[in-house]
Amino acid sequence: VHQQLRTLSKENAEGVAQHLVMVAALLEAEEFDAAMAHAETAVRRAGRVPAAREALGMVAYRTGDFARALGEFRTVRRISGSDHLLPLMVDSERGLGRLDRALDLAQSPEAKRLPAQDRVELAIVVSGIRRDLGQTDAALVALQIPELKRPKQPRLAYAYADTLLGLGRDEEAREWFQRAADADEDYETDAVERLEELDGIAVTDLLPGEEELAPLPPEERTGDGADRA
């Protein structure tokens, strides 16, 4: 991003950088209106800077405005020459209901040249499209990429587990949810909760700072012991 901003004046570059930092922070906090305001300001001040257009596209994507997101991602691709947003472009086509177009884009030559982590994200999106089409077997095949056998791919393992579950292959699904949970150091998924559901363990959500209380002994329960007439 710093390299991209060097095309701007020093004062403008500093201002745009601050807006981009705010976009990232506000997206993390899910304050989408404020994030959009900062992203739009960044684009007004630096419309030819890929990072600014990408920020605007990301806010649009997160808020479900897939047409606008797709337009911004295409602009980033055109002015930067990078295909790293291709998985999000495919998912935006999916969000617009254009599933055939999404699959065509996912099978493009550019998609085949994506680096490993982008291929993972694309595989997850394509699998979701296949499930949208009712093609659950094809959805599973879409996830069977080399990265599936490698560690530290919690989202890929999770998607594979969920698809296996959709096929009624519960034991295999449990194994892959466990792999996802073991790899998920950053809590990107709810694999642990899915495992507990499969194992029939009830999960109680506590508010921050609360602790689960042990049941009272019989003599201290209401209506027992000293309270009994």
Spell out what each predicted region is.
Residues 7-44, 55, 61:
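Alpha-helical segment of the N-proximal tetratricopeptide repeat
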